[in-house]
């Protein structure tokens, strides 16, 4: 009987070694395409298990530090302060760009304003421009929706559009991209920002100019791929080098032609 028990637990341990459970956590921007890719990956690799949750880039990187995730999804590069914490903990982290994303500026569909310069966007999100009539629209108060400070999208927008200046104190922070879409779709004076893959007919994307109004470009897959749209960013996976063997197969699949095709179909810009 003892020999049978020993054999059972030996077989169980071998099975567990071949079922590599991977935990992925972080950016809500990267979340949908990671979920879609993981589902197809597990269908073709039944020995692999992948669980994915959002929460924001900062949450994902913190989980990587705490060893409660194997891969951190991020919509911004890892910060110097985060690198120092990882280094102090003896962790060496690898960065992988898995896709690119165009960050769309959105308004309510009934808003007649269809284009804005970067300077106008900066004025709006910093609270210097407070009424749509100041940018050629109707006499209507501007309601600013943003993301929480733990969001990589929040950080990227601040860097690219606000040129690292502070957001206005009265902006409404949303916990996820879906909440931004919902809020803007229900508020006529609203403005917000979301990843290209989240766009729907519930909101209206506007054309953006980074050359003081000489050229305005809409956020589309084509314009993002050609880098004609000015607000494009990389999307990342981060993992501990010590976990490379565990995460390698999934990351290789994401970067493969099949994985990059899923990324493109999901509304993201492939790296290859």
Predicted regions and their residues:
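Bacterial N-terminal signal peptides that target proteins for export
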Residues: 1-8
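Exported/periplasmic ABC-transporter solute-binding proteins
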Residues: 21-272
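Hydrophobic h-region of N-terminal signal peptides that target proteins for export
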Residues: 8-20
């Amino acid at each position: 009987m003892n020999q049978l028990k020993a054999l059972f637990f030996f077989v169980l341990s071998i099975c567990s070694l071949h079922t590599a459970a991977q935990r992925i956590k972080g950016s809500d921007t990267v979340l949908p395409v990671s979920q879609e890719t993981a589902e197809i990956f597990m269908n073709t690799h039944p020995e692999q298990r992948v669980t994915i949750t959002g929460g924001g880039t900062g949450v994902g990187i913190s989980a990587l530090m705490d060893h409660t995730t194997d891969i951190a999804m991020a919509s911004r590069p890892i910060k110097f302060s985060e690198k120092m914490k990882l280094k102090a903990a003896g962790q060496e982290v690898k960065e992988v760009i898995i896709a690119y994303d165009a960050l769309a500026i959105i308004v309510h569909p009934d808003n007649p304003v269809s284009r804005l310069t970067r300077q106008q966007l900066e004025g709006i999100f910093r609270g210097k421009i407070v009424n749509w009539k100041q940018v050629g629209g109707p006499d209507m108060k501007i309601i600013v929706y943003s993301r929480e400070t733990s969001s990589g999208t929040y950080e990227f927008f601040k860097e690219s559009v606000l040129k690292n200046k502070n957001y206005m104190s009265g902006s409404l922070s949303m916990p996820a991209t879906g909440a931004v879409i919902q809020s803007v779709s229900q508020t006529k004076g609203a403005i917000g920002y979301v990843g290209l893959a989240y766009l729907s007919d519930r909101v209206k994307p506007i054309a953006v100019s980074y050359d003081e109004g000489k050229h305005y470009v809409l956020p589309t897959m084509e314009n993002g791929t050609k880098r004609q749209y000015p607000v494009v960013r990389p999307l990342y996976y981060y993992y501990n080098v010590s976990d490379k063997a565990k995460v390698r197969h999934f990351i290789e699949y994401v970067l493969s032609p099949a994985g990059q095709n899923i990324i493109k179909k999901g509304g993201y810009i492939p790296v290859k």
